């Protein structure tokens, strides 16, 4: 078994986007991402971990020994009973509109929204064996975005970047490449840094402008109040 079978990269690489979630009706299969045959070969060792219940759904074709349709591969997932998945049945007070397994707008609990699962993790699964919490966790695992690697700049790199930013807010490609070689960074990292730095600079400029306007309004208001007080004193003196 490959050591990297369950690494984060291998798991995330096999996942389609959350937009590929499909609405499954009772006795319908769950759609798996269009993975390479090598993944299916490696996943064969895990077929015994999950029960394969029921016959394949109609209108499905066999592709290389796998059940497939429209460039998707299918693993059997059956909703138990016409009343909905087990997660809804476990809590009698939850109707089809309240159960998180059922998308809003569907009036039948016999349909359930399940996100595609990487085939190398789960060949076959029965929704009746999963609780509502497990279904939610499965969907969160699929939809969770991969975190981007954040670059940590050294003091020397930041100083060089800031110095160039004071000279020009929009350095051209050649200037960015020259600076990147100087501080041992990729040009793409320098470009992103300048993009973020310009956004910060605009926020600071806007904040400073708002503070200046507020200060002017306050000074004008104070001046008007002082003038009214002086006018009041003058009126009192004239009356006396």
UniProtKB/Swiss-Prot annotation:
Q: At the top level of its lineage, which domain of life is listed? A: Eukaryota
Q: Which SUPFAM superfamilies match?
A: Homeodomain-like
Q: Does the keyword DNA-binding apply?
A: yes
Region: Disordered, residue numbers = 199-240
Compositional bias ranges of the Basic and acidic residues kind:
225-240
Intracellular or extracellular location(s): Nucleus
Kindly list the GO CC terms recorded for this protein. nucleus
- Pfam families for the chain: Homeodomain
Q: Which CDD domains match?
A: homeodomain (cd00086)
Its keywords, alphabetically, are: Developmental protein, DNA-binding, Homeobox, Nucleus
Q: What is its main location?
A: nucleus
Single GO MF annotation: DNA-binding transcription factor activity, RNA polymerase II-specific
Q: Which residues form a coiled coil?
A: none
Q: Which residues bind DNA?
A: 146-205
According to its UniProt entry, the protein's GO biological process terms are: anterior/posterior axis specification; brain development; dorsal/ventral axis specification; dorsal/ventral pattern formation; neural plate anterior/posterior regionalization; neuroblast delamination; otic vesicle development; regulation of epithelial to mesenchymal transition
Family of this protein: Belongs to the paired homeobox family. Bicoid subfamily.
Annotated protein name in UniProt? Homeobox protein goosecoid
Source species: Danio rerio
Query: Upper taxonomic classification of the species?
Result: Eukaryota, Metazoa, Chordata, Craniata, Vertebrata
